[in-house]
Amino acid sequence: MSSVDTAWLRMDSTTNLMMIVGVMVFDTPINVSRLKTLLEGRLLVYPRFRQYVHDDGLTAHWIDDDTFDMDAHLRRVRLPGAGGERELQAMVADLASERLDKGKPLWQMHLVENYKGGSALITRIHHCIADGIALIGVLLNMTDEDPNAPDTPRAVLGPAKSKVKKFSSDAPESTNIFSALGPLGEQLQNRFAPALQALAPMAGAAQQAFDQLGPLKAPLESALESAMGEGVRIGNAVVAKYNRWTDDPTEAVDTAKMVAGFAQELAYLATMPNDSQTRLKGKTGTVKCVAWSVPLDLTRVKDVGYVLGCSVNDVLLASVAGAIRSYLVSKGDAVADEALLRAFVPVNLRPKGKEYKLGNQFGLVGLELPIGEANPVARVFEVRRRMAALKSGYQAIVSMALLGVVGYLPKAVQRQALGLLSDKGSAVMTNVPGPAKPLYLAGSKIAQNMFWVPQ
C-alpha cells in the first residue's frame, strides 16, 4: 500500500471514520440478482475490492481474501414506516457512523428495496481504496448509457505506454539513476563514487545485522521496499524533468521557482492560523447526521458563472459561503465583515489517463470562505480570486507529499500530525465531475447520486 493510502487507512478514529459514503437513487426497483452478477463482473475486476488490509504497524499490505463472500458486502434492507426521504437519511446516517469490518475488503453496499416506489443503493468505501476521481471511473465501469445493455463483464483499462525514459528498481546493474540522468548523472556519479566505494564494505555487515532481526525482518524489508518504490517514482519524475531541461533551459529557472514555492507553501501550512470561531467549529462526534437538498439545476449555475466570468465551482462555493452566513445570522450570531471560515478543498493531482488506477492522488488546499461578505456578487468574485491564488500555488502538491510522509510515521505520531491540520479548518467541501449523460445500473436509471467524505 502506498504511503498516502496508508495515511488514509490510519486516520480512522471513532469520531471520524475514513469512509466515502454514497447514495444512488433509482426510480425503478433494482433486481438484486442482476446487481450481484454485475458487481462480480465489473466491480471485482478491481483487485482492491477482493482484498483486505493487513497492517503490521510499520507497513500495510493488500492481501487477497480467499473466503470472499459477496453476500457480506451486498445487503438487502427495507426502510421503516413510509419509506421516504427522512427514513433514508436516518439509515444513511446510521451506516455513516458504523465501522467497516477490517477483516474483510473495506467496502459494503446496502440495497434499499422500498424507497419511493423505486430503490436506493447506499455504498460505503474506505478512503484507502481510492479517491473520488478514481471512484467515478469505477462507477462508469459499472454502468451503461443504454438501459437495455447486457451486463457483460468488463476489464479494467490499462495504462497508455509512456514515451518518457525511465529507470526502475529491477533494472540491470548497468542501468541506474546516474546513467538515466545522462551528462548530469555522470557528474553526480563521479562526485559520489569515492563515498560509495568507502561504504561498500559496510554492506556485508549490514546484511548480517539485518538477518539477525528475526520476526522484525519481514516488516522492515517491506517498509524499505515501499520506500524504494517511492524513490523510483520520484526518480522517474526527476528524469522527466531533466529531459525537459535539456530541451528548454528555461525549464530549470521554472523549477527553481517551483522549489521556492514549495518551501513557501510548507512554511504557510506549518504556521496556518485557525479560522474564525463559529458554532460550526467543534469536535466531531460518533453519531453522524446526513442530509441533502433538492437538486440544483446545473444549467442555472452555469448561466450565473457565464455572466460573472466564474467557474461552476466558484459559484457553488460562494453559494455555500452565503448559506453558512445566513445560517449563523439566523441563529443570532454576529458575523464580522472580516470573518472567514476555512474549508479544505480536495484538488485532483492524478495525471490525465490514469483514472483507471485506484488509490489517492489528490492534495488539499485551505480555502477561506468570505462568510463576512454580505453582497452575493462580491462574494463570488472574492471566491474566484482566492481559488485562482490557490490553483497557482503548490499547496495541494505539498499537502499530498506531507500525507505521504505521515503515512510512514508511527500511528501515535500520525494522529498528532493530522490533528494539527484538522484544527485549522471547519469544513471539507468537494465536488467531482460526474457523467454528462444519464446512466443505468443493472437496467435502472440513476435519478440522483450523492456522496459524503470524511470530516
Which residues does each predicted region cover?
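Soluble acyl-CoA-dependent acyltransferase catalytic core bearing the H(X)4D motif
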Residues: 1-3, 12, 21-455
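Short, surface-exposed loop/turn motifs at beta-strand boundaries within globular domains
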Residues: 17-19
